[in-house]
């Protein structure tokens, strides 16, 4: 981590494997030391750079990132190229100190009294600059290939369109297993023990795991969904302590007692098993039977009365029909008589009768 009391170092003059550090004391600002560490002598003019030695003779560093087309960027080719060049540079850098390379002052060296940089003999060897171009290439090639944020050399990411089979699977699974948000855990009791506090959290995890879906191949059968534990209590038991027949659905419906038979157990074919046994000699059973008999008698009397009333209406309507039929026959006979009378009269009398009417 960088400290707030340090300053950026000035650009380093070119160095070679045969060039020793200048005899003058470096300035504090040039090597990033805090102010006030010692008197800052005026900077001496840098020594004239000597031509590079034989080791670094053919090494150059050219930034070609601006000339590379991102569309034509080949990851494998550049990876092999950079790795091969880096191996060569590291081998040359390792052979550099053996060939007579000296120690150079660097910003990370410890400062002695007066702000001067101490030699490498007292505090271990500094990082070897076997040759300037080798270190420079190592520093340039790493970010050139490894950095991803560079806009010019960003690796190409080929977008793959989703296949129709995957979309069909996802739609089918989404229809079979609709997502349901897990119920929130109930608030813990203020005086509950740790065991009581862990139970709601466990139920919440089970409920959350019950909502997960499985992606299977089309040929495999679809498993049933994981049952989610219900926060409601178990379905009510029958009158005799047995669960009602028909499963949990009938148990949740809640059986209604029959007023006629007086049963209070579950419904269906096994209603008699869940019915409470009643003593036939008790007064309660006798009163219930008497009420049932009275209700049956009333219903039978009402049915008989409705039948009698219906028969009376039928008789009345039949008599009215006969009477109307006789009336129709009488009117038909009178019509025939009047027609015979008009046929017997002459036409002159008919004309006179029509004139008088006019």
UniProtKB/Swiss-Prot annotation:
The V296A substitution has little effect on the binding of CEBPA to its consensus site (5'-GCAAT-3'), while greatly increasing affinity for cAMP response element (CRE) sites (5'-GTCAT-3'). Residues 54-72 are annotated as: Required for interaction with TRIB1. It comes from the Eukaryota. Residues 29-38 have a biased composition (Low complexity). Binds DNA as a homodimer and as a heterodimer. Can form stable heterodimers with CEBPB, CEBPD, CEBPE and CEBPG. Can form stable homodimers (also isoform 2 and isoform 3 dimers) and heterodimers with CEBPB (with isoform 2 and isoform 3) and CEBPG. Interacts with PRDM16. Interacts with UBN1. Interacts with ZNF638; this interaction increases transcriptional activation. Interacts with the complex TFDP2:E2F1; the interaction prevents CEBPA binding to target gene promoters and represses its transcriptional activity. Interacts with RB1. Residues 180-194 are annotated as: Required to functionally cooperate with SREBF1 in promoter activation. Residues 1-70 are annotated as: Required to repress E2F1:TFDP1-mediated transcription, to inhibit cell cycle and to induce adipocyte differentiation. Residues 285-300 bind DNA. The modification Phosphoserine is found at residues 193, 230. Changing residue 285 to A: Decreased transcription factor activity. Strongly decreased transcription factor activity. This is CCAAT/enhancer-binding protein alpha. Residues 1-55, 176-195, 213-310 are annotated as: Disordered. The gene is Cebpa. The keyword Iron-sulfur does not apply.
């Amino acid at each position: 981590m960088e400290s707030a009391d340090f300053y950026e170092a000035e650009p380093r003059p070119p160095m070679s494997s045969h060039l020793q550090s200048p005899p003058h004391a470096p300035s504090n600002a040039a090597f990033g030391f805090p102010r006030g560490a010692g008197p800052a002598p005026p900077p001496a003019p840098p020594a004239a750079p000597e031509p590079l030695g034989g080791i670094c003779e053919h090494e150059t560093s050219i930034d070609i990132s601006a000339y590379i087309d991102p569309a034509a960027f080949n990851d494998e080719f550049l990876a092999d190229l950079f790795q091969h060049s880096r191996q060569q540079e590291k081998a040359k850098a390792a052979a550099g100190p053996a060939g007579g390379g000296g120690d150079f002052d660097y910003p990370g060296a410890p400062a002695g009294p007066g702000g001067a940089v101490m030699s490498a003999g007292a505090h271990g060897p500094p990082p070897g600059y076997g040759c300037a171009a080798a270190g420079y290439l190592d520093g340039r090639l790493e970010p050139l290939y490894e950095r991803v944020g560079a806009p010019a050399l960003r690796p190409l990411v080929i977008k793959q369109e989703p296949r129709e089979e995957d979309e069909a699977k996802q739609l089918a699974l989404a229809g079979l297993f609709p997502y349901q948000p897990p119920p929130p855990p109930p608030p813990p009791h203020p005086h509950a023990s740790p065991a009581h506090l862990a139970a709601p959290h466990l139920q919440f995890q089970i409920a959350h795991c019950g909502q997960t879906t499985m992606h299977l191949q089309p040929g495999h059968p679809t498993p049933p969904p994981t049952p989610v534990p219900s926060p409601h209590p178990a379905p009510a038991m029958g009158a005799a302590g047995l669960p009602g027949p028909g499963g949990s659905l009938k148990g949740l419906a809640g059986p209604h007692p029959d007023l006629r038979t007086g049963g209070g157990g579950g419904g269906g074919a096994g209603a008699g098993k869940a019915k409470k046994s009643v003593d036939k000699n008790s007064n309660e059973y006798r009163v219930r039977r008497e009420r049932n008999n009275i209700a049956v008698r009333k219903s039978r009397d009402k049915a008989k009365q409705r039948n009698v009333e219906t028969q009376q209406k039928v008789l009345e309507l039949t008599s009215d029909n006969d009477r109307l039929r006789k009336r129709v026959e009488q009117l038909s006979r009178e019509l025939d008589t009047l027609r015979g009378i008009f046929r017997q009269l002459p036409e002159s009398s008919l004309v006179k009768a029509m004139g008088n009417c006019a």
